[in-house]
Amino acid sequence: LANSAASDTLVTTAISGKPARGLRTRYITEVESLTESLLPYPLQYSMSGPLRKAATKASDPDFLVMWSGQGVGLFRQMPAAELIKTLSAEVAEIRSALF
């Protein structure tokens, strides 16, 4: 995730049958290339369950579901306490600039 960008994401129905944004994976690419129609939610999600479970157990990124927004890659990795302090300082700075 840390090395991903918004261009690495897409909105797809391949995983669940409902449109959702995630990182492009081999699984999504393969399913989207099928000529058959995908199943509606929740059937598509249920049918892909065993594969997703096996991929999680094997830590196989090609078949993992990696839901992600367009802000992927913009996060800052730090301890939670440091994050709260940083966000509080940023909010205070923005508030003082606005008021």
Predicted feature residues:
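Conserved active-site-proximal phosphate/metal-binding subdomains
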Residues: 1-99
